[in-house]
């Protein structure tokens, strides 16, 4: 953490640090509004993926000096629907663009009573509606103690833990909702590559394939059972799947080898199938209701695995112009057998 913090400071990207009562350290980068690092007590090993350009001041300076998307890594907040907000020529898919008002945005740090929040006031353009919508995104952080700390019959000796709660809010700030605009929060975590994403489901649910840039996802890497989707994220290129809100249980995990140990990262969040989940397949824009996504990236953007979830939209037809989301990240690192047991308890799955 010290090296990453120093590099960012040297290139004019200062960080903030949230410390939990259990010793967890959460490294926040206001530039882009991201949680860039998650560290267990006494550990300098980041649970999250960060861009390799951040390994030195020279490469970081060159990276942030470019006009490309500055994908620093970690846990970020975007907005849906992707078709409107990232494809300026939709339904043509010839150009993908991260609106700079959103990422990196212009997040401001607000400090109060020893805590802090990040606030981004922005306007985004909807390509299909040909409308601009003024918004406000606010993010803050709190503790998330080990969910297994009171459980009996499990030996957590030798297992590192780090966790936090992220509070995210979205508001339409104009006096009226422009046109028929609906917009939803979309939170994404980037993790080291080569692991398995584990998506528990209430019943058997076949994931929707969104896109592949090279070939497709081999059937042996995308396994569906009655109560679990397992995506082995090891393909070349970029690949994405999406899962229905009515099926998912509100937890998604990612397990991968970490040196001599294994790491398990779990996101715990609220799913409301009565809400409007507006991120739709690009070829079927009236097919609403997808809440969870997984994206495998092994391309010029880097090598990482993304765990993504959506929050029901606000705006036209929803009766709301403001929403709040609260979600936890629970991260474990330790011997494989113990991490498997944790995965079984919290997700109904293990690394096998």
Question: What residues fall within each predicted segment?
Answer:
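Surface-exposed acidic/polar loop and edge beta-strand patches at domain peripheries
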Residues: 1-165, 169, 173-352
């Amino acid at each position: 953490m010290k090296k990453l913090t120093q590099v960012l400071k040297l290139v004019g990207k200062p960080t903030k640090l949230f410390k939990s009562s259990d010793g967890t350290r959460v490294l926040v980068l206001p530039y882009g509004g991201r949680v860039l690092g998650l560290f267990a007590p006494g550990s300098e090993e980041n649970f999250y993926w960060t861009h390799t350009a951040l390994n030195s001041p020279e490469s970081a300076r060159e990276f942030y000096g470019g006009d490309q998307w500055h994908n620093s890594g970690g846990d970020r907040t975007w907005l849906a629907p992707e078709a409107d907000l990232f494809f300026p020529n939709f339904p043509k898919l010839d150009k993908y663009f991260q609106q700079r008002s959103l990422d990196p945005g212009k997040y401001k740090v607000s400090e109060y009573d020893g805590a802090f929040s990040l606030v981004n006031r922005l306007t985004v353009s909807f390509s299909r509606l040909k409308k601009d919508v003024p918004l406000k995104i606010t993010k803050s952080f709190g503790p998330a103690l080990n969910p297994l700390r009171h459980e009996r019959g499990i030996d957590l000796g030798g297992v590192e833990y780090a966790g936090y709660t992220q509070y995210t809010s979205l508001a339409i700030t104009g006096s009226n909702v422009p046109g028929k605009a609906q917009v939803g929060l979309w939170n994404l975590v980037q993790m080291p590559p080569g692991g398995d994403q584990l998506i528990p489901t209430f019943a058997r649910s076949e994931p929707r394939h969104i896109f592949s840039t090279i070939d497709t996802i081999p059937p042996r890497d995308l396994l569906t059972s009655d109560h679990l989707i397992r995506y082995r994220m090891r393909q070349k290129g970029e690949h994405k799947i999406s899962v229905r809100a009515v099926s998912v249980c509100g937890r998604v995990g990612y397990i991968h080898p970490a040196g001599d140990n294994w790491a398990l990262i779990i996101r715990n969040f609220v799913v409301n199938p009565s809400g409007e989940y507006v991120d739709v397949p690009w070829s079927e824009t009236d097919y609403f209701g997808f809440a969870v996504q997984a994206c495998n990236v092994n391309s010029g953007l880097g090598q990482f695995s993304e765990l993504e979830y959506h929050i029901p939209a606000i705006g036209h037809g929803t009766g709301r112009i403001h929403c709040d989301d609260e979600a936890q990240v629970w991260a474990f690192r330790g011997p494989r057998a113990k991490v498997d047991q944790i995965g079984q308890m919290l997700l109904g799955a293990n690394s096998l």
